[in-house]
Amino acid sequence: MSVLDRLLRGLLARPVGDLIRQALDDELYRYRVHGDPGRLHVDPTAVINNALFNVSAGEITVGPYAFFGHNVSVLTGNHDINKFGRERQTAIQRSGRDVVVGDGAWLASHVLVLGPCRIGEHAVVAAGSLVTHDVAPYTVVAGRPATLVRRIEHGEAGA
């Protein structure tokens, strides 16, 4: 292959590669909302990535400087196991299952949060964890279901 051929191939491949990279980046940082988007409140300083928010049964609030890894799901909705057929699909509680993610909280990749619950400020939820209850501020939780791993020391300067 001549130098000219390699140069032309490189020039043609670069813009296409850039477009593909941009499309992938856009998908990695786009979150989805199931339900009324007005029930989702995300502080502008929060970093969300490609999360799924289900607001069918409550509000979801994400505080300042909170951040999510990839593929985090926050669900307020659930279905009544005592219903059957179409009624099981449609009998959904419409409120009261709010989720609050506190200031500076970190939800690592593949975390699943089932409301109602509150994740305290500066708490850390380890990758792959299942949150089914409140998480205290300044704690690390992990597992399915998430349980306390340790407390995070904090002082006036770091708070």
Protein language model regions, located:
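Sequence-level detector for tyrosine residue identity
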Residues: Y29-Y31, Y65, Y138
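Short, functionally important structural connectors and interaction interfaces within domains
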Residues: R32-H34, A91, A127
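Flexible, glycine/small-residue-enriched loop-and-beta-strand segment within the central core
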Residues: D36, H41-V42, V47-R118, R144-P145, ...
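Conserved acidic donor-binding loop of glycosyltransferase catalytic domains
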Residues: L75, A126, T132-H133, V149-R151
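C-terminal/domain-terminus segments
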Residues: R118-A142
